[in-house]
């Protein structure tokens, strides 16, 4: 959270839209960093909204949760002072259209914060064809569903094309090795390996892999965490821009 959110702050009283809040993981961090701002957090999934409400205690926090589609926003133009989007565009078939929809409800002078990963930025040791196979299954499965897990490198072009100004994109590099056990556990194992394992059934259904090859690949990928010389590197990208008009 510090890596991605240490420089995200909103002024007291400002109205912030969080588009694609999921189960509220980022919402909780936003509230922690800007306790006196007001948040509207939306997601297309009602089960996720229910979980987010439970996790943040909506009744006693300055956040309102809303189940809606970000391509059909129920807000007047120029409603929000700021907009925050994290790990959403990679799942969309039309990220350009999503940015334009969101921009329409942002006030002139307001900031737009956008965070995405880039699966093409992944490097690890021990490296192997087996480990790269399951990683590539993750990338290909998302691509076949219309998403783009390599979208991190496109943040600047996307924001520029949408008409934002004062665009600043910064890479947020993650490096995990045995000398940083908290990163090995929290990132390599519980984020990366868990994320790849989560696409197993879809990869099998799509014919991208077989069961034996998948298990061999996951064992190889986990060695980046449990090997005495295991290393995992990954880069997130954070873009902040302003709507002038």
Where in the sequence are the language-model features?
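Class I SAM-dependent methyltransferase SAM/SAH-binding core
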Residues: 15-17, 23-73, 97
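Conserved Class I S-adenosyl-L-methionine
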Residues: 168-245
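A short acidic, Gly/Pro-enriched loop at the edge of an enzyme's catalytic core
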Residues: 71-82
